[in-house]
Amino acid sequence: MAARRKARKRALEVLFEADQRGLAPLDVLKDKILRADPPVGEYAVTVVEGVVEHQARIDEVLSTYSMAWPLDRMPAVDRALLRIGTWEVLYAADVPDHVAVSEAVEIAQELSTDESPKFVNGLLARIAELKETLSA
């Protein structure tokens, strides 16, 4: 699982950088692949491409269930991490929901604010709970 964790972090770096610099995530991804320092793994590419492909729906789901936290008011790290976690829950059939949630929470503990892990856990757990209705 360590390889997947690294891939999630790498995908987070790409999405965060794109968000902060106002660039297209796929352009940032291509740049990172070309520089390959550190290398961008296959799963990181899959995650970024998946988030980009489904971003409108992912953002709609996050906006609906994040209650009083509009996406643009969330810390950028949390926003990127929640997009990754939501993509894994809704679209990555090979990732169990509990793994997607716990990985996102652990990365939030490492990289975000003190409040973020609880917020990420609650929101992604709710999305996982409603997965069947959200995927329809």
UniProtKB/Swiss-Prot annotation:
**SUPFAM superfamilies referenced in this protein's UniProt entry, alphabetically:** NusB-like (SSF48013)
InterPro entries attached here?
NusB-like_sf (IPR035926), NusB_fam (IPR011605), NusB_RsmB_TIM44 (IPR006027)
A Gene Ontology biological process noted in the UniProt record is: transcription antitermination
Ordered alphabetically, the record's keywords are: RNA-binding, Transcription, Transcription antitermination, Transcription regulation
Alphabetized GO MF terms:
RNA binding
Q: Which GO terms describe its cellular component?
A: cytosol
| Transmembrane feature ranges | none
Give the matching Pfam families: NusB (PF01029)
Q: Which family does it belong to?
A: Belongs to the NusB family.
Relate the protein's function as given in its record.
Answer: Involved in transcription antitermination. Required for transcription of ribosomal RNA (rRNA) genes. Binds specifically to the boxA antiterminator sequence of the ribosomal RNA (rrn) operons.
User: Can you say what this protein is called?
Assistant: Transcription antitermination protein NusB
Q: Which organism is it from?
A: Kineococcus radiotolerans (strain ATCC BAA-149 / DSM 14245 / SRS30216)
List the top taxonomic levels of the source. Answer: Bacteria, Bacillati, Actinomycetota, Actinomycetes, Kineosporiales
